[in-house]
Curated annotation (Swiss-Prot):
<comment type="similarity">
    <text>Belongs to the prokaryotic pantothenate kinase family.</text>
</comment>
<dbReference type="GO" id="GO:0015937">
    <property type="term" value="P:coenzyme A biosynthetic process"/>
</dbReference>
<dbReference type="InterPro" id="IPR006083">
    <property type="entry name" value="PRK/URK"/>
</dbReference>
<dbReference type="GO" id="GO:0004594">
    <property type="term" value="F:pantothenate kinase activity"/>
</dbReference>
<comment type="pathway">
    <text>Cofactor biosynthesis; coenzyme A biosynthesis; CoA from (R)-pantothenate: step 1/5.</text>
</comment>
<dbReference type="GO" id="GO:0005737">
    <property type="term" value="C:cytoplasm"/>
</dbReference>
<keyword id="KW-0067">ATP-binding</keyword>
<keyword id="KW-0547">Nucleotide-binding</keyword>
<feature type="binding site">
    <location>
        <begin position="95"/>
        <end position="102"/>
    </location>
    <ligand>
        <name>ATP</name>
    </ligand>
</feature>
<keyword id="KW-0173">Coenzyme A biosynthesis</keyword>
<keyword id="KW-0963">Cytoplasm</keyword>
<dbReference type="InterPro" id="IPR027417">
    <property type="entry name" value="P-loop_NTPase"/>
</dbReference>
<keyword id="KW-0808">Transferase</keyword>
<dbReference type="Pfam" id="PF00485">
    <property type="entry name" value="PRK"/>
</dbReference>
<keyword id="KW-0418">Kinase</keyword>
<protein>
    <recommendedName>
        <fullName>Pantothenate kinase</fullName>
        <ecNumber>2.7.1.33</ecNumber>
    </recommendedName>
</protein>
<dbReference type="InterPro" id="IPR004566">
    <property type="entry name" value="PanK"/>
</dbReference>
Length: 316
């Protein structure tokens, strides 16, 4: 089978970096270098070039989709003779631990909020919808954090469903990576945003991923556009270990950190522990629960070294 025939058979349009960058058209750069520095993750090299060549074309595409969605809503309101409720456009961002989902989410939030049509862009991570440590310990799931059974999926689905139903406001629990737990009474209020960006390991999962907790509605049912941030397994492992080493010298040194004891490790000991955590927990979760959802995404961004995106696949 020729490459052209294979391309015609795939559900995705495929772009290399140069082809994707050309789709920026004339969209202006609205972020400064200082802003980009604040947006990037602890383990990433995010440059103006990366934002210009990858994220500006993506924000342009999303703006087209969002504008089309608003026109569709207006047609429905005209047909029904109703006043429009503010229904957010929901973008989900999935991918492995350490792949850079949070940076992608923050950059898109910053770029999309600068478009004149939709200023109010909220970002919520699904970490907040993990069961509290007390519940996970009771159920023997502390080593399964991030796996499907560790989430309060009913609460997450209700949160997204409420926003899509046009409720004036909804609350989302907030997770602290410092204390490695959901913050008690730390809920964040989300009030009718134009766009909601939902970032997490589990946002592309569906009923087949939750056989232990059967229910009929899932987060993915409410998502308008989904992004999967992808990278080769060996890079993900390397990024995870490097991030762990940086935390060892930074966040873990805080006496309040759940992982404060890790700050006392030698570099060799830290690498051994990070490698073990990757192999026994994160790699297993990736293979069993995250990677199988990749082909459900509207768009797949594939990263190479230094977290630079070298391929984009867009669902036809």
């Amino acid at each position: 089978m020729s490459q052209k025939e294979q391309t015609l058979m795939t559900p995705y349009l495929q772009f290399n970096r140069h082809q994707w960058a050309a789709l920026r058209d004339s969209v202006p750069m609205t972020l400064t270098e200082d802003e980009i520095t604040r947006l990037k993750g602890i383990n990433e090299d995010l440059s103006l070039e990366e934002v210009a060549e990858i994220y500006l074309p993506l924000s342009r595409l999303l703006n087209f989709y969002i504008s089309s969605n608003l026109r569709r809503q207006a047609v429905l309101e005209q047909f029904l003779g109703t006043n429009g409720q503010r229904i957010p456009y929901i973008i989900s961002i999935a991918g492995s631990v350490a792949v850079g989902k949070s940076t992608t989410a923050r950059v898109l939030q910053a770029l999309l909020s600068r478009w004149p049509e939709h200023r109010h862009v909220e970002l919520i991570t699904t970490d907040g919808f993990l069961h509290p440590n007390s519940v996970l310990k009771e159920r023997g799931l502390m080593k399964k954090k991030g796996f499907p059974q560790s989430y309060d999926m009913h609460r997450l689905v209700k949160f997204v469903s409420d926003l899509k139903s046009g409720v004036p406001q909804a609350t989302a629990p907030v997770y602290s990576h410092l204390i490695y737990d959901v913050i008690p009474d730390g809920d964040k209020t989300v009030a009718q945003p134009d766009i909601l960006i939902l970032e997490g390991l589990n946002v592309l999962q569906s009923g087949m991923d939750y056989p232990h907790d059967p229910h009929h509605v899932f987060v993915s049912d409410f998502v308008d556009f989904s992004i999967y941030v992808d990278a080769p397994e060996e890079l993900l492992k390397s990024w995870y270990i490097n991030r762990f080493l940086k935390f060892r010298e930074g966040a873990f040194t805080d006496p309040d950190s759940y992982f404060h004891n890790y700050a006392k490790l030698s570099k060799e000991e830290a690498v051994d522990i990070a490698t073990s955590l990757w192999n026994e927990i994160n790699l297993m979760n990736l293979k069993e629960n995250i990677l199988p959802t990749r082909e459900r995404a509207s768009l797949i961004m594939t990263k190479s070294a230094n977290h630079s995106v070298n391929q984009v696949r867009l669902r036809k």
